[in-house]
């Protein structure tokens, strides 16, 4: 269920854009990592590329043992240790969440690291789902050194948590290649100095 938000937080739809190793929104920008193979229009399962294009931001998943329930107009759901996401192209539930154990290959969403402490599901390859076109594309927490991802977009945890309250149904992310094509998705600027002002560190507890 979406959390209750103030009128100011519901004022307008916030859209995001990734380009050249940074994530942009109306209030600023921050360093971001993309796929190790860069940004591609013809993404395939397992190629390490981030899909180019504009996609809806669908919902939020979070680790209830690590962060409080995020405030957002998007649907918010806590992860559990049995959550998975199918990455087997031949399976009927390809690119869909499932409960583990599952008979086909599926990514474990309850990770030992911090990358999925909170994430936004990006609506890539969903309507319809095309076998082999790529799965489990998220906006999630970056590694400390902003290492390239397997195809997702990743930012600092405080940046991600700060953006969640202003995302709403209708919010989209536009992903373009440009400068990141030459670096395989590795970020050049990792300062994070443009992290937005909506985030309050005390809210993490």
Located regions from the model:
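Cell wall/extracellular polymer interaction/catalysis modules
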Residues: 1-149, 160-205
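Short cysteine clusters
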Residues: 152
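A conserved hydrophobic position in a structured secondary element of the catalytic/binding core
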Residues: 155
